[in-house]
Amino acid sequence: MSAVMTPAGFTDYKVADITLAAWGRRELIIAESEMPALMGLRRKYAGQQPLKGAKILGCIHMTIQTGVLIETLVALGAEVRWSSCNIFSTQDQAAAAIAAAGIPVFAWKGETEEEYEWCIEQTILKDGQPWDANMVLDDGGDLTEILHKKYPQMLERIHGITEETTTGVHRLLDMLKNGTLKVPAINVNDSVTKSKNDNKYGCRHSLNDAIKRGTDHLLSGKQALVIGYGDVGKGSSQSLRQEGMIVKVAEVDPICAMQACMDGFEVVSPYKNGINDGTEASIDAALLGKIDLIVTTTGNVNVCDANMLKALKKRAVVCNIGHFDNEIDTAFMRKNWAWEEVKPQVHKIHRTGKDGFDAYNDDYLILLAEGRLVNLGNATGHPSRIMDGSFANQVLAQIHLFEQKYADLPAAEKAKRLSVEVLPKKLDEEVALEMVKGFGGVVTQLTPKQAEYIGVSVEGPFKPDTYRY
């Protein structure tokens, strides 16, 4: 094994095992070859150093792909301090490789809730005092919330927040509506090169991988219920169909439900006539009694509630690929049923009571990743080529906000600029072009006459903001 040396005297990190750094570095090198957009931005902007002076607080899954993102930010001039946004999602070899490179990181797989919050605090603090950060890169909104609640004085120096996922965007929009958001944010999640790649195509790849790794089950011929048919639900449904499962979809949005029908999925409800009145009587027990696998994909709370869990088929697999663990009512399961760990991130939930269980009892559910992100808890998440688009968006969003220097503006101007916006389409197209080049593709250029005819520039952007890809 080739050695990776941590800079002498560098102790500003906490990872599971620093000796995993060489392994992590080897995987980082491979990931770089699979992330053409991110590496293209690194080459394109390295000479300009657009992030020189940027001090970025980062809270996103500490994976190999995130390691490439971190080192790209550093290559463009930034200083960063990093933690993971999920207690199970860290790849310990990735965290070790970043620490060995002299970059502050606080993350390991299997953190407790208390350790998770401690890790975020360690990114905020340097030598026991709030770091003079001026940018935030978040996934899910926990870092953003802690800064607003516990360190509001730091927000006076912060130019902006870039948010990775649906849940975090919802939290930002709520804060903006309630008047509690203090700095502008870019909604990276709804960039086309994020939402279509990460949310749809990424889940198509990684969901069935995680379920198979966690359970060793054959999926073909079995029945699955996917809760939600947004981009994550679409990719998840395709992922299970690829395995030969009989996939049904539950949706609250008629448009998404229509899309599911058009894509060949049966749209059903776990509730009789679609109405949840909070009672067991409202559950469609005949439907749930046939379901072998249930997957939540919504970013909403209790979409797989206690009454549904009671009615599910014996030995059904239950998992979530939304951001937080509250999509499934795991609190009810902890309070009322016995948990038996089969292996890390795989539990048998015995529905025979809270105290004790018979190991040979067959009235149980198999819960993956304790209801947290299954693809990162039970597998390694999306492949590098998928995360390439998401993280290239993050880099461009960080540059975009850092150049605007919100914290330096007069108060009156700040009030006008306070918003949650999607990354400009021209930047979205820049990411897409680099990704196409990475596949060896060639994009056709409009002639001036063609561009004039449809009312766009030869260089783009090519679609209005209202266009639905």
UniProtKB/Swiss-Prot annotation:
It is an enzyme of class 3 (hydrolase). Keywords: Cytoplasm, Hydrolase, NAD, One-carbon metabolism. This is Adenosylhomocysteinase. It catalyses: S-adenosyl-L-homocysteine + H2O = L-homocysteine + adenosine. InterPro entries: Adenosylhomocyst_ase-like_sf, Adenosylhomocysteinase-like, Ado_hCys_hydrolase_NAD-bd, NAD(P)-bd_dom_sf, S-Ado-L-homoCys_hydrolase_CS. The lineage of its organism: Bacteria, Pseudomonadati, Pseudomonadota, Gammaproteobacteria, Pseudomonadales. Its EC number is 3.13.2.1. Its cofactor is NAD(+). Substrate binds at T63, D139, E164, K194, D198. SMART domains: AdoHcyase, AdoHcyase_NAD. One of its GO terms (biological process) is L-homocysteine biosynthetic process. Belongs to the adenosylhomocysteinase family. Pfam families: AdoHcyase (PF05221), AdoHcyase_NAD (PF00670).
